[in-house]
Amino acid sequence: MSKKKENPFSFFSYVKDESDTSSLPPPPAPIHSPSSSDNIEIPLPVFNNNNNNNNTTTTNNNTNNSNTSTSNNSKNNRKTAISFDDDDDDGDEEDEEEEDDDDDDDDDDDETNNIKSSLPQLQPQTQPQPQPQPQPQPQPPIKPTITKATPINKNVNKEINNNNNNNNNNNNTTTTTINNINNIATSANNAGTTTSKKKLIQLFDDDDTNYDDEEKLEKFDRSTPMSLPKEIPKKVSSTLSNSFDPNIIHNQSSPPPPPISIPIPLPTTDNLNNINSNNNNNNNNNNNNNNNNNNNNNNNNNNNNNNNNNNNNNNNNSNIAPPPPSSSSMVNNVNNNSSDNSSSNNNEENENLKAEITKLKTLIKGLKIQCIKYKGDKELSESKLLQSENRLEQFKLKEANETKIMEDMVAQVEENLNAMKKRAQYAENQVEQMKQEIQQLRHQNQQNSMNNPEMQELRYRLQDAKEKGRMVSQLLFQASNDADLNIKNLMRGIETLQNVSALLFSIDKISTIPNQK
């Protein structure tokens, strides 16, 4: 069995409809920061008698275009949300299939290691610090560019006559169109933010996701703590509010600041609670804005009907002078530009949010894998702790038994020592008593010997016997010596007699020996 290898970043499938691409606004042009070397030429509005009425007619068209653009944006947001949910469901089914494959194949660890080595490592997101904007330097005077007047049509003359008769109606329509544009911009912004926040809440509320595919991801290095921005700085918030406010008309000396994209802070429990509360508030605001938009659309339709009736009634008045140029056309142009910018910014924000959601999903999967591994490590450590605790208890019991045995032995030795001490003391007492008795007996013997006369006579007799024995021994020694000398002299006489007898026996032989001369 071979495991399914899938791209972990395939949770988005962007839905593109050919019908909606035509109505989408073009992407915004990049805004350059002002420099001293660039000569900026800003076109100034020129009000002609012929163009005033064209501006009044284009306001209603702009409101309709803005309504269609916002509706298309909301459709796109809904389609991306539906596709996002479908991809999540497909991912869950695939995860269940892979769980079955993993149960059959537990020995395919090398493949997972290769997949892990092939995946890119995720780095912790860090918030870019807002760079200080350079101070604008004095610039040379800007040359205004004058736009050419368009040719006058027959319909324009009719509208001029209608405007002379219906100045009050036009003032009401301009105010309503401005309010409509503002409400549409705010509703578009709120719709983009609410969809993204709902997706974030769904990400962190899903607890039924499968974790088999997550083992393919690489470990995320959590050695560095991730910083969670609690609040947006005041400077950045002020620049954001100024950059997206459609009612602000920027001067020539201070060009509009570029839009600033701030990274989304990582979600915590406090942030999720705040997001839920903000979502409820945003939903209520969106409902109120939709109701206001419907009311404004009804008012616009009524005003258009009144204008048409007035045009039919005043076709004959063709030579009346045009009214003075009003500032409402300029405000409408600025509002239209701001609505286009806001829609383009909303699209960019949606794309950025989708990219960040993908990163956050990979982060969440990595963190879930780490949680699973940490749980396994925790269980192993707990089992080791239990084993070590059991060993400690057994060791403590052994030590307690050994200490008891040693204490018993020490107690017995102490008892024996005490008994030996008692015996030694008793023996010493007995020895002292015997010494005293011996001294007493000696004393008594001396006293008895001094007092008895018989003992004295016996002593004298012994002394006489000793002296007599000495005298007898000396006399016997002298007698023995004299006897030895006498015996020796007798032996010498015997020898001499033997020699003489031997000479006398050899005399006959000597006489018979002839003489030889």
Swiss-Prot record:
Renumbered residue ranges of the record's region Disordered: 16-148, 156-175, 216-351
Keyword match Isomerase: no
Originating organism: Dictyostelium discoideum (Social amoeba)
GO biological process, one term: regulation of cytokinesis
Domain of life: Eukaryota
Family statement drawn from the similarity comment of this UniProt entry: Belongs to the ENTR1 family.
CC annotations in GO: centrosome; early endosome; midbody; recycling endosome
UniProt keyword Coiled coil, yes or no: yes
Extent of Polar residues compositional bias: 236-252
InterPro entries noted in UniProt: ENTR1
This protein's UniProt keywords: Coiled coil
Coiled coil spans: 340-452
Protein name in UniProt: Uncharacterized ENTR1 family protein
Biased composition (Acidic residues): 84-112
Listed Low complexity bias regions: 48-75, 271-320, 327-347
Biased composition (Pro residues): 127-143, 254-266
